[in-house]
């Protein structure tokens, strides 16, 4: 049996495997910062690790039609499915072409980003695949990271450079920002990279909106949000939250580990403002993937040292309500379960879940 990481707070150290002793209530790894956080929690419940075995777990998304959760192991080049009825986890797509972010649109179709091909795709209900976007103004995208559907049929997604490396897809071809001297061969062991046609990163790290007509428009520039990552709408779709994360491969500057908020005016974004600097007790809880609940609270993965790794929870005004401490860095979260009242957390090598007294606000 693999050794399990201990809790960062309990004594004796908490064990996370399924055969471990039960956890006392209330769960000591759920940290109440504001009393309002209690209204979102099931007191007689605990965080559970339901699966482990990935390299870098990402992109959880819930299928209401299929009653399953899909998530990515980006570096493991596999997309997994967690069945609600049985709790079984199995490979859904392998290779996944280094799928990263996932969601489901309002027709129940799965949306995915693929680091390998640097594109956004949609899996139709008949099993076929449609390429949504792989270029902008004639230039290849960097590596679309996360995405979110809108009720008008549009798809909004971020395009940082994180997938442009050997571990998450393939590096640029010779001369590109992630392979300036050409010593790396992107074709070794992955001849499908030839489909890229020798292209390398050219575009800034922008955020885009794909319209159902097929038109792709830039809604945020790199200057507004450098290295954009996770994003999500408020429950009324009047606000878009976008994460700016740290320096990626080939970057000269990089992002700043904060969350921005924007007013949504049709296909345009206005009134940029800082939602949170993500500093908790002097520690940067680097944000990644985001989801909102029906009350407008923002749930963010936290890339931070032990004790602060996990999930941070913020009210719509940007006030910290509480934290969920995990023994691994958490990249992304999603609400799921038949009632959409379970928070799934993809954290490095594992998948965790916690039942709540709130529900996810949007499909996927």
PLM-predicted stretches and their roles:
Residues 7-46, 362-364:
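Blade/loop signatures of beta-propeller domains
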């Amino acid at each position: 049996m693999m050794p399990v990481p201990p809790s960062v707070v309990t004594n004796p150290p908490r064990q996370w495997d399924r055969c471990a002793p039960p956890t006392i209530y209330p769960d000591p790894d759920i940290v109440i910062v504001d009393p309002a956080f209690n209204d979102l929690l099931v007191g007689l419940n605990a965080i559970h690790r339901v699966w482990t075995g990935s390299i870098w777990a990402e992109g959880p998304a819930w299928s209401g039609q299929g009653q399953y959760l899909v998530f990515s192991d980006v570096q493991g080049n596999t997309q997994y499915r967690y069945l609600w009825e049985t709790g079984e986890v199995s490979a859904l797509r392998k290779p996944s072409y280094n799928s990263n972010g996932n969601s489901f649109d309002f027709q129940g179709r799965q949306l995915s980003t693929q680091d390998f091909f640097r594109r956004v795709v949609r899996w139709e209900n008949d099993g076929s695949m449609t390429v949504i976007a792989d270029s902008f103004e004639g230039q290849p995208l960097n590596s679309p990271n996360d995405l979110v559907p809108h009720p008008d049929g549009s798809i909004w997604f971020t395009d940082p450079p994180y997938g442009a490396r050997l571990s998450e897809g393939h590096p640029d071809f010779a001369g590109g920002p992630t392979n300036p001297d050409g010593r790396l061969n992107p074709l070794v062991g992955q001849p499908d990279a030839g489909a890229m046609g020798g292209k390398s990163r050219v575009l800034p790290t922008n955020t885009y909106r794909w319209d159902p007509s097929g038109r792709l428009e830039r809604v945020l520039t790199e200057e507004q949000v450098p290295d954009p990552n996770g994003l999500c709408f408020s429950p009324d779709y009047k606000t878009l939250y976008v994460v700016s994360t740290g320096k990626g491969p080939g970057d000269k500057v990089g992002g700043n580990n904060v969350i921005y908020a924007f007013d949504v005016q049709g296909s345009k974004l206005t009134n940029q403002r800082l939602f949170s600097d993500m500093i908790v007790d002097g520690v940067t809880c680097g944000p990644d993937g985001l989801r909102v609940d029906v009350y407008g609270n923002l749930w963010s993965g936290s890339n931070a040292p032990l004790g602060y790794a996990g999930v941070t929870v913020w009210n719509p005004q940007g006030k910290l309500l509480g934290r969920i401490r995990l023994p691994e860095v958490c990249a992304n979260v999603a609400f799921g379960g038949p009632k959409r009242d379970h928070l799934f957390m993809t954290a490095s090598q594992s998948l965790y879940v916690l039942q709540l007294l709130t529900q996810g606000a949007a499909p996927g």
